[in-house]
């Protein structure tokens, strides 16, 4: 099964949106196999967002993601990358559909609440950047039989 890294960014934490966002993820049937509250330091932020280095918004992105605590989680499931991305909505909240996390809770692109892996390859890379193998739990739920064939 695919794995996706999700980061509830400092604005999501400060606005008290951890519970509502985690509820949506769990209600969709995705398995949370790793979860932690942490403060991302500048070195980790630069590694995570290395693809954006040199872009005009890079410095403000690093300042934002390191400005307060975040909740980082790993979710698994069939087609998890695509599912999570559709739940999250467009990067620009102004273009995010109602019913998505950003469409319902975010207002501007610079404070868009949540990061989600954009490909299976990046999902694996990001999971390994933020979690050690022993921090992840291979959890099976009793409800899985009602979610997966």
From Swiss-Prot:
UniProt GO molecular function: ATP binding; metal ion binding; nucleoside diphosphate kinase activity
GO BP term, pick one: CTP biosynthetic process
Keywords: ATP-binding, Cytoplasm, Kinase, Magnesium, Metal-binding, Nucleotide metabolism, Nucleotide-binding, Phosphoprotein, Transferase
Enzyme class: transferase
Active site as annotated: 115 (pros-phosphohistidine intermediate)
Name of the featured protein: Nucleoside diphosphate kinase
Protein family (similarity comment): Belongs to the NDK family.
Oligomer status and interactors: Homotetramer.
GO cellular component: cytoplasm
Reaction catalyzed: a 2'-deoxyribonucleoside 5'-diphosphate + ATP = a 2'-deoxyribonucleoside 5'-triphosphate + ADP; a ribonucleoside 5'-diphosphate + ATP = a ribonucleoside 5'-triphosphate + ADP
EC number: 2.7.4.6
InterPro entries reported in the protein's UniProt record: NDK-like_dom (IPR034907), NDK-like_dom_sf (IPR036850), Nucleoside_diP_kinase (IPR001564), Nucleoside_diP_kinase_AS (IPR023005)
PROSITE patterns: NDPK, NDPK_LIKE
Chain's role: Major role in the synthesis of nucleoside triphosphates other than ATP. The ATP gamma phosphate is transferred to the NDP beta phosphate via a ping-pong mechanism, using a phosphorylated active-site intermediate.
Coiled-coil blocks: none
Localization terms from the record: Cytoplasm
Annotated organism of origin: Roseiflexus castenholzii (strain DSM 13941 / HLO8)
Cofactor(s) needed for function: Mg(2+)
UniProt: ATP binding residues: 9, 57, 85, 91, 102, 112
HAMAP family: NDP_kinase
Keyword Cytoplasm attached: yes
């Amino acid at each position: 099964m695919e794995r996706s890294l999700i980061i509830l960014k400092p604005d999501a934490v400060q606005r008290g949106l951890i519970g509502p966002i985690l509820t949506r993820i769990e209600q969709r049937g995705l398995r949370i196999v790793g979860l932690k509250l942490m403060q991302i330091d500048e070195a980790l932020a630069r590694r995570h967002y290395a693809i954006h280095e040199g872009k005009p918004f890079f410095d403000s992105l690093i300042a934002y993601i390191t400005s307060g605590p975040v909740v980082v989680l790993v979710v698994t499931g069939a087609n998890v990358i695509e599912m999570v991305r559709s739940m999250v909505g467009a990067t620009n909240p102004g273009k995010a559909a109602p019913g998505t996390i950003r469409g319902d809770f975010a207002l501007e692109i610079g404070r868009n609440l949540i990061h989600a892996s954009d490909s299976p390859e990046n999902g694996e890379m990001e999971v390994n950047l933020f979690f050690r193998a022993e921090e992840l739990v291979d959890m099976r739920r009793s409800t899985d039989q009602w979610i997966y064939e």
